[in-house]
């Protein structure tokens, strides 16, 4: 069961962290939520650095997920997936939010930084958090991808 959620955005949407944390605290009081940089929009953060730091923490907190936000969502996703054991996706719809967890056991969910999409992000986060990994044949696939990564294939 997920017991910690970490939220991190780059400088494009600084207040996203607080909005998402507020939603998590109201809806999931059993989950401890943390926020990482930046403190204001003047503090520039490069997404590769951000992804490296936050994704390394997943190894320390096994039952956790990360919510990452950057201008496109794609660059932070790509950077996150360079870190071993990370399974990250950009999510734009309900089906993807469910399937990345159910079939791929995703531990990072990424969004693009747009204020007007915040309501849909709350819904997608809720779907993601309420979905369980199905194991079975899906575990074999996740292990194959991990093996390919570890062997640089």
Model segments located where?
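Short, high-confidence coil segments that cap the C-terminus of an alpha-helix
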Residues: 2, 62-64, 105
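C-terminal binding/interaction regions
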Residues: 6-15, 94-153
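Short, conserved beta-strand edge motifs with alternating hydrophobic and charged residues
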Residues: 8, 33-37, 66-70
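Short, solvent-exposed amphipathic alpha-helices that sit
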Residues: 15-26
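Solvent-exposed polar/charged
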Residues: 26, 81-82, 102
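A short beta-strand-loop structural module common to alpha/beta enzyme folds
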Residues: 30-44
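Helix-adjacent hinge/juxtasegments
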Residues: 50-90
